[in-house]
């Protein structure tokens, strides 16, 4: 029991060593794994927005294994990064790794007790690390993804061009060959970003009048999202409306978006996918008047 207590205190001291005004020499040998934490409640939009960070880490640490810890299925085609589910057996050695938390998620906190190095946002909006000292804090209301990851990149001495960040390819599957569909992702988790249900009804009725296309609704199996899209389906009441909400994987959703002649959505995860692979897209940001 005493031995366990001593071991715990040692790990705790090591994890909180960022409070000591020293900077450790970070030397990543090829056997050090780079582990990037992107766990829920972060969404697929967060994964897309953080993808330039993964690409830059791949380019910097060319001899190291790169891992992304996330609950989402693989839908982004990185060059070398492997995906690991948090609940599955770890393919990497956390005790011999650098763990990076680019966003504040409290489930990321447990990893600092297991890793050799850590840097990122683990229990506050302050950048914390056990190999460097930083006073950077991001704004909880206006801090952008890029400002957060730039600070991490600077700490790791990684060069980047703010104006020309690279994005990866979004993966698809052979789910559909129809390119005449209009794909709509009507639901968003944040009320302030939600385009009103009644406006979506008007929009779809207008589309059905002016073109012979089929409208495909997409979304996750989130009960609130399923219910919202069911209401929309009932109010539109058309044989040319196909509600795929809750029935498509991320890869199938990506395939539908990439092959549609038009994508329409809110500021949500599917819209981030559409930004990279849709032929044409319309995205409503905040309270937008349809008229």
Segment roles from a protein language model:
Residues 1-291:
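Catalytic machinery of carbohydrate-active enzymes
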């Amino acid at each position: 029991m005493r031995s366990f207590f001593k071991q715990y205190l040692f790990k705790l001291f090591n994890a909180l060593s960022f409070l000591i005004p020293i900077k450790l020499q970070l030397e990543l040998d090829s056997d050090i794994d780079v582990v990037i934490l992107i766990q829920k409640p972060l969404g697929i939009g967060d994964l897309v927005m953080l993808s330039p960070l993964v690409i830059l880490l791949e380019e910097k640490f060319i001899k190291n294994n790169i891992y992304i810890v996330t609950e989402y299925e693989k839908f982004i085609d990185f060059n070398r990064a492997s995906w690991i589910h948090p609940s599955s057996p770890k393919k990497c050695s956390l005790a011999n790794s650098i763990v990076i938390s680019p966003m504040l998620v409290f489930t990321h906190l447990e990893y600092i007790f297991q890793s050799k190095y850590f840097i990122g946002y683990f229990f506050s909006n302050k950048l914390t690390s056990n190999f460097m000292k930083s006073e950077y804090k991001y704004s909880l209301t206006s801090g952008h993804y890029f400002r957060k990851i730039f600070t991490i990149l600077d700490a790791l001495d990684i060069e980047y061009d703010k104006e020309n960040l690279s994005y990866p390819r979004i993966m698809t599957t052979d789910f559909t060959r129809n390119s005449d569909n209009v794909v709509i992702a009507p639901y968003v988790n944040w009320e302030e970003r939600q385009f009103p249900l009644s406006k979506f009804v008007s929009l779809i009725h207008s589309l059905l009048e002016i073109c012979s296309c089929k409208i495909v609704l997409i979304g996750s199996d989130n009960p609130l999202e399923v219910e919202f899209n069911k209401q929309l389906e009932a109010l539109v009441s058309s044989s040319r409306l196909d509600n795929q909400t809750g029935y498509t994987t991320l890869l199938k959703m990506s395939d539908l978006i990439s092959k549609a002649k038009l994508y329409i959505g809110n500021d949500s995860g599917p819209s981030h996918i559409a930004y990279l692979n849709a032929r044409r897209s319309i995205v409503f940001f905040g309270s937008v008047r349809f008229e």
